From Swiss-Prot:
Protein name (database record): Ferredoxin
CDD domains: fer2 (cd00207)
Modified residues (N6-acetyllysine): 119
Protein function: Ferredoxins are iron-sulfur proteins that transfer electrons in a wide variety of metabolic reactions.
Pfam families noted in UniProt: Fer2
Gene Ontology molecular function, alphabetical: 2 iron, 2 sulfur cluster binding; metal ion binding
Amino acid sequence: MPTVEYLNYETLDDQGWDMDDDDLFEKAADAGLDGEDYGTMEVAEGEYILEAAEAQGYDWPFSCRAGACANCASIVKEGEIDMDMQQILSDEEVEEKDVRLTCIGSPAADEVKIVYNAKHLDYLQNRVI
């Protein structure tokens, strides 16, 4: 079963960390963050990451659950996430900026690292509901 290591973008921002820090997840592991802001979870084959987070009792952001907004956006830092059809992200955002939507995204690697709650990034703001 794939494992997703996750970090809340708001926590990254509050701590003054940079999305491109090589040791971003090590810093998060050492920071004593609560389980909703940083941790790992198993995601069943074909299960959406947002659903897995909710099954853990986490209140991750979402709105449409259909890939039509950017409320649940995350940035893939390691591994790969397959998404169902979506209409909101540009090819550049998916291919170069590694943006994925957790409401329609499932891990496509045994280990995936994401920064969720990425809706706060400037280039996604105009697609948040």
